[in-house]
Design a protein with these regions (language model features):
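Conserved catalytic neighborhood of penicillin-recognizing serine enzymes
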Residues: 145-171, 236, 300-311, 504-570, ...
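Peptidoglycan glycan-strand catalytic modules in the bacterial/periplasmic cell-wall system
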Residues: 6, 79-289, 311, 472, ...
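N-terminal type II signal-anchor transmembrane helix
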Residues: 2-86, 124, 144, 361
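Short, well-structured active-site flanking segments
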Residues: 126-136, 221-223, 283-288, 500-524, ...
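Active-site SXXK
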Residues: 116-118, 276, 350, 461-462, ...
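A penicillin-recognizing enzyme superfamily signal
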Residues: 340, 344-360, 392-458, 463, ...
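Non-catalytic structural connector segments
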Residues: 148, 283-341, 345-409
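Mid-domain, small-residue-enriched loop/turn segments at the edges of structured enzyme/sensor domains
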Residues: 524-532, 564-604, 613, 617-618
């Protein structure tokens, strides 16, 4: 450091010496010359020096002044502009931005705003060429005489500063490190850029660019966002007094902010109105009248996650991350227009359905557990240190342990000291309340909420039409539609599809009976005897059609089919139909849905059946348009025949059997869609071990829906099927959504029947056969994974809330009769 200072001091000393030599040489040139010639020579020399200085700054001579934008950069400015997300029905559903800015044209702004701006910020705007020399002289005079400073920067200079970030983005070079010279170099660059801007653009373009780039405070960049933020209006509809408020803020956005400092804003607004009067743009009567108007705001600060479909928008951001990197775009600054598949009306129906059903589920969950702690192991015992383990994974715990490394008492004190904290609630429309809770208590409060996800998809395109990732994005950012959970009996779709692939039909029969088999237990590292059982632990001993076994979700038949068809082949079929998560191809329990998958891929796979065996990749974005209006991305429209038409047709019949067969687990869907008699519906419920995960998948020819319900941690769940089964929790979400969509005339195109068989090899005898009627009372607990001996190595993942399974499969007790539905 000392050597560096000595070098700088030495350089400065040499520079002073050389400067004195040059000045002495220059002085000697004019010894004996008349004074007027000396004056001219000095003036010309200063002018040439100034021009050379400007050129040196512009080209960054010897890296002394730092880089400046060239003409190419000025003609193609890179303003940070928000990217907008549009729904399929052309509704703006959100933005991605660092600076919330949406450009507008000159014509889209009220002309009085331009007059207001020029009268206040740059009264000689139309007569100068970027630099107002009269203004400079006036500012210098005021500074010398002490009569108060006036601004000398023109609108063009302010644009140069705002658009090209001269004071931050571009360095000031070596000379800029010398005290006092940095501001001179910065102002010089602003003059140069302002002159270039005047050469490249007309005056209206400069005004437009200025209004689109300037910061109006409160996170509002540009006139369009400012008009919306402060007045909930458009630039075209701004009144004169509103324009005066916005222009007045430009002098100091905090001091004159109408929200935070209304008195200052009022005084500044009135001064701006006086400026307009002085320049003849309003009359004295108009000025006095406008001054009497109180400031009335409709203040709303737009945030990244305001509006609909927050989880969907986050999914879009994740999907486009790689595309943006590969194509040179920044999702948050490039001003892209992203057109998505989602329908804003269907999204509203989905969010309403989730809210309505989850309020009921949460109330049931609270009443069900009462004052007991709901985090229990597979034996129903409270898990020790459950909350403490979660607290230790929180950032606040890591901060406190770093601050007090040798003082655990201080850490415990702060973790257990109550303080006001905003938490989620179903008790108000804002879904938020403030409670006095400690860190420990807030964690305990939040983990008791039940969660959900919902997806609606078009089977003919793979386009997602509605997407709910959880109950509140503000409180839980993790998207449950992509969470890995056990699908339970919803996975049986693939078991029976492979059975159809291998020549079986819905009317072929299998017996519901006890059997056992030797399997490898990865935990014990030995072979064990595995006895798959039905949800109620009872086998009928009867032979039944496959459509009845599927509709009633008989586990023994599904496992037996899994062994007949081959687990690996079932997994291959699942992959072809749209499952991307890795499946345990060695576990017989895969037939009962023991491998984790997510709702989005499961919904996509069910679409394959609905679209006659054709698989379409899940699509969130249809096209992207850049800031210049050029189409830079169009979603590919491809499909492949994943399974045969015959298998798909027969599985359509199987899914419909879930609503039509006696004891079908999806029968309660009729309570929601019964009036839509012009549409075929089918479905499959699913519930994983201990009711930790509840599912429902609903299909119709033109729309497929899926819902998941469960705790954030698998150890948090209902204890009984009466409350925790997929038919009681997830199915109503799908039902409420379908009810709204089917009753809306705008969605008539989603009505319809499945086609009659196109394959002459398909006969009615394959799927039209007598139903199976049980000789005993069946239970609702027929959609659960029930395996007496755990044959999977499923570990608890401590670093995430949604994790793998936490306990052994065990038989679920009989809870409720089907006739109670």
């Amino acid at each position: 450091m000392k050597n560096k200072k000595e070098q700088i001091a030495g350089f400065a000393s040499k520079a002073r010496y050389k400067t004195k030599q040059i000045l002495q040489w220059y002085k000697n040139l004019y010894i004996g010359t008349p004074w007027w010639k000396k004056t001219i020579a000095v003036f010309v020399s200063l002018l040439i020096t100034f021009i050379l200085y400007l050129g040196a700054v512009d080209i960054n001579l010897f890296w002394l002044f730092g880089k400046s934008p060239g003409f190419s950069r000025i003609l193609n400015p890179e303003t940070s502009t928000a990217s907008e997300i549009y729904s399929a029905d052309s509704v703006l559903i959100g933005k991605f931005f660092n600076e919330n800015r949406t450009p507008v044209s000159y014509e889209e702004v009220n002309p009085m705003f331009w007059k207001c701006l020029i009268d206040t910020e740059d009264e000689r705007f139309y007569s100068h060429h970027g630099i107002d020399f009269l203004g400079l002289f006036g500012a210098a005079k005021d500074a010398i005489t002490g009569h108060g400073g006036r601004g000398a920067s023109t609108i063009t200079q302010q644009l140069a500063k705002n658009m090209f970030r001269v004071r931050s983005q571009y360095s000031t070079g070596i000379i800029g490190k010398i005290p006092g010279l940095k501001i001179l170099i910065v102002k010089t660059k602003e003059w140069i850029i302002a002159t270039k801007l005047e050469m490249c653009y007309d005056k209206n373009d400069i005004l437009r660019m200025y209004a689109n780039t300037v910061d109006f405070g409160s996170g509002a960049y540009g006139i369009k966002t400012a008009a919306k933020t402060y007045f909930k209006t458009t630039p075209k509809d701004l009144t004169i007094e509103q324009s005066a408020i916005l222009v007045g803020m430009l002098k100091a956005t905090t001091f004159y902010n109408p929200k935070n400092n209304p008195k200052n804003s009022l005084q500044r607004r009135n001064q701006v109105l006086e400026n307009m009067l002085t320049h003849g743009h309003i009359t004295r009567a108009e000025c006095d009248s406008l001054k009497q108007i109180e400031i009335k705001l409709s203040y709303t600060v737009e945030k990244n996650y305001d509006g609909q479909a927050q989880y969907f928008r986050e999914a879009v951001a994740n999907e486009l991350s790689e595309w943006c990197d590969e194509n040179g775009y920044d999702l948050y600054t490039s001003g892209l227009k992203i057109y998505t598949t989602i329908d804003s009306r269907m999204q509203r129906y989905a969010e309403d359905a989730v809210a309505k059903q989850m309020k009921v589920i949460q109330r049931n969950f609270k009443n069900h557990w009462g004052n007991r702690e709901p985090w229990v192991d597979e034996k129903g015992n409270t898990i020790p240190n459950f909350i403490d383990d979660i607290v230790k994974r929180q950032p606040v715990y890591k901060y406190l342990t770093a601050k007090y490394p040798n003082n655990p008492d201080s850490v415990d004190y702060y973790l257990n000291t109550p303080h006001p904290v905003k938490v989620f609630t179903w008790d108000n429309d804002q879904l938020e309340t403030t409670l006095d809770l400690s860190v420990v208590d807030s964690v305990k409060y939040m983990v008791k909420f039940m969660h959900c996800a919902f997806v609606a998809m078009e089977p003919q395109t793979g386009e997602v039409k509605a997407y709910v990732g959880d109950i509140s994005f503000r409180s839980w950012k993790y998207d449950k539609a992509r969470a890995q959970r056990q699908p339970g009996s919803t996975f049986k779709l693939f078991v029976y599809t492979e059975a159809m692939n291998q020549g079986l039909t819905p009317c072929d029969k299998r017996r519901d009976e006890f059997f056992s088999m030797d399997v490898w237990d990865a935990k014990k590292k030995e072979s064990v005897r595995w006895t798959p059982s039905n949800a109620d632990g009872v086998f009928s001993g009867d032979s039944m059609p496959l459509k009845s076994a599927f509709a009633k979700s008989i586990n023994s038949v599904a496992v037996r089919l899994g062994q007949e068809m081959g687990i690996r082949r079932i997994a291959e079929t699942a992959y072809k139909m749209g499952i991307k998560s890795p499946l345990d191809e060695s576990a017989p329990s895969l037939a009962l849905g023991s491998s984790d998958i997510n709702l989005l891929e499961l919904t996509n796979a069910y679409c394959t059946v609905a679209d006659d065996g054709k698989h379409h990749e899940t699509t969130l974005v249809t096209k992207i348009v850049d800031s210049k209006g050029a189409e830079v991305y169009v979603a590919p429209n491809t499909s492949e025949q994943a399974i045969s038409y015959k298998s798909a047709f027969l599985m359509q019949k199987m899914l419909q059997a879930g609503m039509r067969e006696p004891g079908g687990t999806s029968m309660s869907l009729w309570g929601y869609v019964g009036k839509a008699n012009d549409t075929d519906f089918g479905g499959k419920t699913g519930t994983s071990n201990n009711h930790s995960d509840a599912w429902f998948m609903g299909v119709s020819p033109k729309l497929v829906v899926g819902a998941w319900v469960g705790g954030e941690y698998r150890s948090i769940h209902f204890r009984t099927g009466a409350l925790g089964q997929g038919s009681r929790t997830a199915l109503p979400i799908c039902g409420l959504f379908l009810q709204s969509v089917m009753n809306d005339p705008a969605f008539k195109h989603y009505h319809g029947h499945f086609n009659k068989p196109k394959d002459p090899g398909i006969t009615s005898s394959m799927y039209e056969c007598s139903s199976y009627y049980s000789q005993r009372n069946d239970t609702i607990d027929v959609d659960s994974v029930t395996v007496e001996n755990d044959i999977e190595a499923i570990e608890h993942e401590e670093n995430q809330g949604i994790s793998a399974g936490e306990g052994e499969h065990r038989p679920i007790e009989k809870e409720i009769k089907l006739e109670d539905l």
